[in-house]
C-alpha cells in the first residue's frame, strides 16, 4: 500500500510511514526496501513521514536509561557537508559537559570527512561495543557518554544493501541523528541544508523536546563556524524561530574554512585533543566555543550565545575540558593513547 501511494506521488501518513519502516527494519526484501526508499527520496519526505520512520527506528533500537537528574542533551550533525573540517560536535560535547551540561553523545564514523565521532572515541581507546549499562554509568559519573550508532541500531544493518542500491541519501540518513538511544529529545543538530534547518526543531518538538536548535553556516558547514555567518533555528518555550548568527558580533574573530580543515584522521584526533587542552589555533578554539555555546543554550545552562561562549572559554582555558577528557579516558579508554596525542 505504501509503495502504491508513493508511486502516485502521494504522501504517507505517520502511521503508514511507521509501518513501512518497520517492515524494512524487520526483514523486508532488498528490492522492495530499495524501491520504498527511492520513492520517498524522489518525492521528498514530509515531517509526518520522518516522524513515522523515526518512531520505527527507535522501537528497533537498544536503549540506554540515563540515571541523571535534569536535562540530558545530544550534540550531533547530519554530516555530508563534504568539507573535512575539525570534528566540532565531539569537542563541543566535552566542552558543554565540562560547563555543566549532561551530554549523551550519539554518533558514527565519518561519512564524508576525515573523522567522525566514533573515530575519535576509538582513537581514545574506547570500546565502541560498550554495554548500555556502562554508558549510563559514565553519563552518571562524568555527565558525558558516547553511544556508537551501529551498536544501538542493529536493525539498520539489515537494510544496508537496500541503501547501497539506492545509491544516495535516504530517509534513514535524515532520521539517524535524531534516534538517540538514551531517549534524548533536546538536541543541537548541525545540518547542511536550509530545508532541514527549519524542520528539525519542529520534528523534535513533536517528539517531546522542550529545547532544540538546528544550525548551519553560510559556507556550507553543518555547524556554526567563525569562517562565515550562520543561522540557528531554535525551539524554546514551544515556539520555533530562526536567528542569524554573526560570530564577530559575539566577540569572536573571523577565520577561513581552511583554518578549520583537517587532512587526515590522525590530524583530526590531534586537533580534537588540542582544542580541549587549550592548545589549538584560535579559529578551531573559537568555532568549538561557538557551538558549545549553542549546546549550553539547548541545555538551559546559558541564556544566549554570548553567555555560552564565555562559559565555554572558561571551561577550555581553565582546564575543566581537558580534565574531563582525562577522567573520561581513565574510565573508558586508554590513557596511553591520549598521552601519545599530547606528545
From Swiss-Prot:
It catalyses: N-(5-phospho-beta-D-ribosyl)anthranilate + diphosphate = 5-phospho-alpha-D-ribose 1-diphosphate + anthranilate. Pathway: Amino-acid biosynthesis; L-tryptophan biosynthesis; L-tryptophan from chorismate: step 2/5. Anthranilate 1 binds at residues 77, 108. Its cofactor is Mg(2+). Binds 2 magnesium ions per monomer. It comes from the Archaea. Anthranilate 2 binds at residue 163. 5-phospho-alpha-D-ribose 1-diphosphate binds at residues 77, 80-81, 85, 87-90, 105-113, 117. The keyword RNA-binding does not apply. The keyword Glycosyltransferase applies. Keywords: Amino-acid biosynthesis, Aromatic amino acid biosynthesis, Glycosyltransferase, Magnesium, Metal-binding, Transferase, Tryptophan biosynthesis. Its EC number is 2.4.2.18. GO terms for molecular function: anthranilate phosphoribosyltransferase activity; magnesium ion binding. Mg(2+) 1 binds at residues 89, 223. Gene3D superfamilies: Nucleoside phosphorylase/phosphoribosyltransferase catalytic domain, Transferase, Pyrimidine Nucleoside Phosphorylase, Chain C. Pfam families: Glycos_trans_3N, Glycos_transf_3. One of its GO terms (biological process) is L-tryptophan biosynthetic process. One of its GO terms (cellular component) is cytosol. Catalyzes the transfer of the phosphoribosyl group of 5-phosphorylribose-1-pyrophosphate (PRPP) to anthranilate to yield N-(5'-phosphoribosyl)-anthranilate (PRA). Belongs to the anthranilate phosphoribosyltransferase family. This is Anthranilate phosphoribosyltransferase.
